[in-house]
UniProtKB/Swiss-Prot annotation:
SUPFAM superfamilies: Phospholipase A2, PLA2. Transmembrane segments: none annotated. The keyword Signal applies. This is Basic phospholipase A2 homolog MitTx-beta. Belongs to the phospholipase A2 family. Group I subfamily. K49 sub-subfamily. PROSITE patterns: PA2_ASP. It comes from the Eukaryota. Residues 1-30 form the signal peptide. It comes from Micrurus tener tener (Texas coral snake). Heterodimer of an alpha (Kunitz-type) and a beta (phospholipase A2 homolog) chains; non-covalently-linked. Its main location: secreted. GO terms for biological process: arachidonate secretion; lipid catabolic process; phospholipid metabolic process.
Length: 149
């Protein structure tokens, strides 16, 4: 019987370790740094109020949003889906430029963005403006996931 090449053994070990590590990683919130900055600029609520809100403002799907604010996040997710399927964008890892006047509903995505960056920026812009007009219900923050079936 032939001995296994040490380099192959090393690669096999690395793959096994990475698979074991990946299986223990809990689902992560979406990479939404620019969206967080838009919220921070236009709203006096803290970002943490919107993380883990309802069914759509977290990394889970649902049949029905729990309220208007959750509908804003549902629309953003649908916009991101369109960005991927129609435009080939990667909205969860994409950085873009935008301008904002602090605590105003004046957000501008027209900077020197590519078509994808501009599209994703406008997904976040629309969601941010929607959130500004939606009522925040603290009972929908950190809700039981069973409500999102």
């Amino acid at each position: 019987m032939d001995k296994m090449n040490p380099a192959h053994l090393l690669v096999l070990a690395a793959v096994c370790v990475s698979l074991l590590g990946a299986s223990s990683i809990p689902p992560q919130a979406l990479n939404l740094n620019q969206f967080r900055l838009m919220i921070k600029c236009t709203n006096d609520r803290v970002w943490a109020d919107f993380v883990d809100y309802g069914c759509y403002c977290v990394a889970r799907d649902s049949n029905t949003p729990v309220d208007d604010l959750d509908r804003c996040c549902q629309a953003q997710k649908q916009c991101y889906d369109e960005a991927v399927k129609v435009h080939g964008c990667k909205p969860l890892v994409m950085f873009y430029s935008f301008e904002c006047r602090y605590l105003a509903s004046d957000l501008d995505c027209s900077g020197n963005n590519t078509k994808c960056r501009n599209f994703v920026c406008n997904c976040d812009r629309t969601a941010t403006l929607c959130i500004l007009t939606a009522t925040y219900n603290r009972n929908n923050h950190k809700i039981d996931p069973s409500r999102c079936q």
